[in-house]
Amino acid sequence: MALLRPLLLDNVASIQQSAALALGRLANYSDELAVVQNEILPQLVYSLGEQKRYYKKAAAFVLRAVAKHSPPLAQAVVDSGALDSLVACLEDFDPGVKEAAAWALGYVAGHNAQLASTVVDAGAISLLVLCVQEPELSLKRISASALADIAKHSPEQAQAVVDAGSVAYLAPLIAHQDAKLKRQVCACLSQIAKHSVDLAEMVVEAEIFPKILLYVKDVDQHVRKHAATVVREIAKHTPELAQLIVGNGGVAALVEYVGESRGNNRLPGIMALGYIGAFSETLALSVIASKGLRLLFEALTTEPEDHLKSASAWSLGQLGRHTPEHAKALADIGALPRLMELQASASSSEDLKVECKRALKAIVAKLTHLPALDALVQGAGSTEHAGVVNAVLAQISKVLPNDSSGRSSFVSSGGFAKVLSLPTEDGSETRESVDIISSCHPDEIVRFYSPGYSESLLKKLEA
């Protein structure tokens, strides 16, 4: 670094440029503070305003390479006074200089809200929106990416991006032929839409539906993922926005997307289906009718990553918590035993256990199908199941008094004996549920299936 710094001041322009490129490449692969410590940044910032376009590109490359590693290094770039010079470069006649500056600004803004605010305060947004309108593809991509990096941190920063008129220019670009540009545009729209209802409605009003749903089926998997993310970020806000997606055929597109994707690419689709189904029983039925349940269950069963299983469990819980019919649909595909198994598994993460437990409790609270409740009781083994078993017993105590045929099958299946064998404490909710269940059966049946009854009979014989 010490050897390269004097070359930045060389009289020969090509040597200056080569030195800057060398610095940029070194900084790009190392997060060491050498670039900052050798007072090279002020020299680069000065050169941004004075030198020719080739050197400007090289200098912006160095600033980008330094800023990308960490917030402290990005802050060092800000402290060197680079932002004003980089923003000025966005007005340069050379597209390459604009692109290099936009890229550096995006890296600075991407780290945290405070750094993004400094980029906003430097006046970058309106110029980045102008860059999106330029004919050069790479400049469009980098500018859209930089706007996304600004918008992602807070509603205020996303609103600043919207106020500059960005959505009107970004939205038509989702139909562009270039896959990388579509990817960046979708990423930016999703970062805007995620913050609030108003911002999501601004994105919707740019008439992205139903076009965006076509790109949930795009040949490029990254475009598909980012398009599904836009749908997810819009769906989560209100029933009206979720209904808009359903009305445009969004559920079928999302179900197909979840079925064809694997790994992390599935996550936006899984979450979007859960958000849509969470709002009302009608919207949940639209997901169930589109065969979404089986794909969510398949993800819960086959995906190796716990965070994907957690998302699937959450979505299943949102779909099954509305009515007995919704809950039975979950029971019919075998989702409840799997949720119970994951909730008690030692290999499951804490987040997965919590999501499975919440989903089970929400579904069981609406479940009136006695065979499914019976299966859950009999499948309960470890103390990890205790919280769920309490919810199941409470639900059985509500269902059983009104189901005479169910009482008989509950006894013959072994479910009643299992209930009586469960350890309970006097005065507990579990004890209360067991007493209600017992009161639905004749005393002879209760005695016969109570633990220790056979031993007491043998003692009578011996006597």
Q: At which residue positions do the language-model features occur?
A:
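Buried hydrophobic core positions in alpha-solenoid tandem helical repeats
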Residues: L3-R5, Q43-V45, S85-V87, L127-V129, ...
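Alpha-helical solenoid repeat architecture
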Residues: P6, Q17-Y29, Y46, K57-H69, ...
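Short inter-helical turns and helix N-cap capping residues of alpha-solenoid HEAT/ARM repeat scaffolds
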Residues: N11-V12, Q51-K52, F93-D94, P135-E136, ...
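Intrinsic low-complexity tandem-repeat regions in disordered proteins
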Residues: L23, L41, A59, L63, ...
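A structural feature that tracks compact, well-ordered secondary-structure segments
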Residues: C89, L130-C131, P172-L173, E201, ...
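Short, hydrophobic/charged alpha-helical patches characteristic of ARM/HEAT alpha-solenoid repeats
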Residues: M1-L3, I15, D31-E39, Y54-Y55, ...
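Residues that form ligand- and interface-recognition hot spots within folded domains
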Residues: L8, L48, L90, G123, ...
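Intrinsically disordered, low-complexity regulatory regions
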Residues: V364, A394-I396, F416-A463
